[in-house]
Each structure stands twice: as structure tokens, then as C-alpha cells.
Amino acid sequence: MALDRSALIPALKNVATRLRIDSVRSTSEAGSGHPTSCCSAADIMAALFFAELRFDPQDPHNVDADRFVLSKGHAAPILYAAWAEAGAFDRAELLNLRKIDSDLEGHPTPRLPFVDVATGSLGQGICAAIGSALNARRIRSDYRTYVLLGDGESAEGSVWEAADTAAVDGLDNLCGIVDVNALGQSRATMWGHDMEALAARWRAFGWHAIVIDGHDVGAILDAFGEARRTVGRPTMILARTIKGKGISFVEGKDGWHGKAFKKGEELDRALAELEKQFVPAPAGANLTSLITKPAARPRAVESPKTVAPPAYKLGDEIATREAYGVALAKLGEADSRVVALDADVKNSTFSDKFEKVFPERFYENYIAEQVMIGAAMGLAARGAIPFPSTFACFLTRAFDFIRMAAISNVGIKMAGSHAGISIGEDGPSQMALEDLAMFRAQPDFAVLYPSDGVSTER
């Protein structure tokens, strides 16, 4: 039975306090981490996990479960604390944070079953969240995707590539939250607590923007409800928060980013202050038992069809990039999981051959290679087989995303056309010379360099 609001809010406040305590305690045990960045997000995380998300702690891969991406990956301790609070694993395991033999790394990776993509390189989580939201459309699921960003992170250009893309695609199943605590690593963030300036930017990019007090649990719940009711565009909740919230001697103070509390007097003082913040809650207010679980439906088992072999005649001339387009369309016919992503060069890479046959599985990202690779990561993490393609030299713009895709161990198939000096007359800006080294430097990457149309298709 659902709790009424008068019972729910104090229960969520107590969850937020426990999340702060667990984050502080685990980082102090590790001797490193970002406890103040966790404390600013605690009320958001409590409301999100225990009053908004539909998920099953024991089945995080449920295809219809809502997805959460922690784009501000340095706040990993509070992500782990939330999953422990939900019953995914024993709370005592949190004290193994950052140990060499623990999966609870300093920034989250898919070594954990409840993490879809690795984050920590800022500005990437929102791009992956777009891929997750697109995948919900692909499989005709009503799951929603939530992504938590930091305000310092929001200076990254890839965040605004994502903002553009999500708005153009009308992703009303995507909800972002910016933890606006106004402090970065070394100084105040770009816009501080100027909430209307931040909101104006998101609105200008076509998002529904909501400004709230990020420590007012009731306001957080209302914002999530408003996001669910918003149709035709994504929502960004801008939550005004205080870094280090709940611990008086670090609240809103610069110089505490990435610093664990020292064991002894400093840690004891922080924990003592947090322990005093529990509020009376109705008996039986067990939020874990109230988590809304999606219905369990059998995971679809794809049975790909046989792909037709190349059908060129002796003497036919075909560019490798055109053969790529032919092969991509064949793969799309053989396997419904195959999707294609483009950076406004589909008529050069010939991925438009796929678009003509499967427009609903073709995603145009325009000239924004970072969000193209990030969205491919999110799609792959949810079961799609994405083929992002552009000129090979322009894939180097997304090098950090490719690096994180390798860490995430997601199966994306990148195609770069106009390789090497084959486009010599266009000059060096169009030549792909460094990309092979970039790809070969990544673990478990296979690099294929076809010599003709037949080898391209095969």
C-alpha cells in the first residue's frame, strides 16, 4: 500500500540522511572520494529511487525497468548507497569502496549489474541517457530514463550537443536533473546559483525546465510528476543544492571537493551532525517494500536471419563506403536490433541506404560526433546493435567517448569513411591518419580495414 504524502516525505528525508551517512562513512574508510558531492544530491537520490523509479533491485536488467545514469560519476558512493538501501546488496559492502578487489570503484562501471555505462568522464552520461531513451522507443516500452548531472559538468560541450539532440528528437521519456551546488573542484561553477540563467539555457535548447529547491523533498516529487506529464520534449530539473549539505563545517565551502573526512574527530563530528537529522516517521514506513517493480516479461531472443552474400559481378566497381551502406541495410533486414546513427554525412557514408528501409531505426545526430557515440553506448547497453558512422577523421572528436565505450564494454560498431589519405584533394583536415592508433589503443577493440567492396560486406 502506498504511503500518503505526509508519511512519505519524512520517510524519504530519513533515507536521504542514511545515504549521506553511508557516503561519508564509505569514503572515509577508503581514504578518498567525494562525500560533499554526494551530500548535495542525497535528497534527489532518495526521492528518485524510493518514490519515482520503477525497478527491481534483484533484476536490474528488466527490459521495462526505468533507467538511471549517474553522469556526475564522482558521486558514485551515493549511487552504491541507494542500491544498498534498496536491498541490492548488503550495506556492509559499502565499506569496501575503492578497494582493489571490490566492484565498488571510485566511479561506476558496468562491472555492477545496475550500471548501464561507465561514467566519471564528465559530460557523457546525458549522451548515453539519450541512447537509453531512444531504445525505449525501439522496443515500444514505456520505461523512462533519468540522468543526474553536476552543474560544473554542464560546462562540457557534449552536454549541449545532447541538449540539442534530445529536444529535436522530442524525448519526453527523458528526465535530467542538474545538482546545482554551485561549487566545482577548484572554484565556484560558471553560473553559481543563478537558477534562472541556467533554466533559460535549457529552455532555449527546447527542454521543459523546472527550478526547485533540491533539498525540499516535496518539491522534488512534484517536479518528477510534472516531468512525467510533459509531452513532446525532455525535462530538465534544476535543483538548487548545497555542497556538503547536512554537515555544518563543510556546507557550501570551497576546498572540500574530493576530500574524504579524516577518521577521528573530523569524521565523528560529521557523523554526529548527520545522526541528529533523522525525523519522526510513521511506523512501518518501509520504502524498500514500496518500490514499484515493472512487470516481468520474457526477454526477447532474437533469431537473426542469414545475411545475403555480396552479389557483385566480375569487373564491377564499388567504393568501400557504398558497400558499407549496402551491407548495413542487409544487416538491418537480418536483425531488428541493428540501428544506425549518423552525423550529417549519410549520403557520403551511404548509411542512408539503411535509413530508406528502416527509418524508425535510423538516428540523425547532425554534426555532433560526441553525442552520436554516447547515444550509441546507451543503445548498446540496452540491447541494440548500433552502427554510428561518419568520416573516419571526425571519429577522433569523440575519442574520450570511445575510450569510455571500451571501459563500458558495450558492443558498438563504428564505421569511418574516407580513410587515410584517400581524400587527398580535400586537404589534411579531412584525412584520417590518427584514428587507427586511437582505436588500437582501446582494449578488446577489433579494427578492420577492408580493401574492397566484398571485404567490406563480409
Outline where the language-model segments fall.
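Thiamine diphosphate
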Residues: 1-146, 268-269, 281-458
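Glycine-rich ThDP/TPP pyrophosphate-binding loop and its adjacent helix/strand module
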Residues: 55-61, 65-67, 103-281, 441-458
